[in-house]
Amino acid sequence: MGYVLKRKKMALMVFGVMTIGFLSLVIPAIYFEMNGNPAIAELGITQEMGSMEGKEVRFGSAASAYWAINTTCTSNGSVNAMHDSMTPLTGLFAMLGMMVNSFYGGVGVGFINFYVFIILAVFIGGLMVGRTPEFLGKKVEAKEVKIAMIIALIHPLMILGGTALTSFLYSGSPEIYASWLKNPSHHGFSEFLYEFSSASANNGSGFEGLGDNTPFWNITTGLVMLICRYLPIIGPVAIAGMLASKKYIPESAGTLKTDTSTFGILILAVIGIVAALAFFPALTLGPLAEYFVMSGM
C-alpha cells in the first residue's frame, strides 16, 4: 500500500495498528494457556507445560495458543491444536480475532475490512475536530459512511443473530437438538458463538465438540458465509468507486491527517467500539462465564 499510494508513513501506521491489535490478543492467550486449566489443577495434576489438553507435545501450550490467534486473525482456519479444549479466555481471544476480522487482512480480500474502519475513523475524526472528512484527497460524505456502517454491522448481526437462533431452538427443545452439544451450559453457548464467528469471518476452524454436520448447521452457516463473504467485498469496492469519481482536494490546514499515531489510536478505538464491544454481552454469557465458574468465583 505504501508503494502504490506513495504514502509509506500511512502504511506504517496501518501496520502498527494491526500489530498492536494482534499483540493485544496473542499475549494474553499465550499467558492463560501456559498457566494451565483451573479445573485440572483442582484434581491435583501438575501442569508444568501449561494446559496440554487437545495439544501436541511437539508444539506445547505456547505455540498452540500463538497459532490459534494467528489463524483466527487472518481467516486462515488451519489449526495445530483443538480450540475446543483451550482454556475459556484463550478461546475468547481466538473468537475476538474473528469478530474484529481486521488485523493483517484475510485470505483473498487483503485488508478490505480494515479499510471500512478507516473510512469510519476518518468521518468520526473529522466531526470530532471540526475538519472536513477526507481520505487520500477525496471527501468522505454520507453515502460512503452509510455503506461502511452497513458493512461493519453485517458481521455482528450474522454472528449474534445465528447464535441467538440456535440458542432459542436448543433451549426450547433440548431433547430434539441433543446431538448438537456434548458440553451444554456456558461452553455450549461458546461453541454456537464460535461456529457462526468462523463462518462469518471466512475462517473455517471450529469448537469441534459441536455436532455441526446436520442440515440445520450446514444451511445456516452456509447462508452466513454467503452474506458475509460477498457483501463486505461489494461495499468497499463501491466506496472506492465513489471516491475515485470525486475531484482531488489538496491537503490544507483543515485536513485530518491519516498517517499519524493519533489517527491510529482513533482507528483502534473505532474497532473496539464498533466491532469488539458489539460482542461483549455474548462473550460474557460464554467464555467469560465459563472462566469464572471454572475458577470457582
Functional labels for PLM-detected ranges:
Residues 2-5, 127-141, 238-259:
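Alpha-helical transmembrane segments
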Residues 39-109, 175-227, 282-297:
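P-loop potassium selectivity filter motif centered on the GYG triad
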Residues 49-52, 138-156, 177-188, 255-270:
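Interfacial and helix-entry/exit segments of alpha-helical transmembrane bundles
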Residues 124, 166-170, 232-245, 276-293:
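Membrane-helix cytosolic exit motif
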Residues 2-36, 108-113, 145-167, 228, ...:
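Selective recognition of specific alpha-helical transmembrane segments in multi-pass small-molecule
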Residues 116-120, 125, 129, 147-187, ...:
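C-terminal catalytic subdomain
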Residues 217, 222-270:
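C-terminal structured "cap/appendage" subdomains that terminate the fold
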Residues 252-297:
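In a subset of proteins, long, contiguous C-terminal domains/tails are tracked
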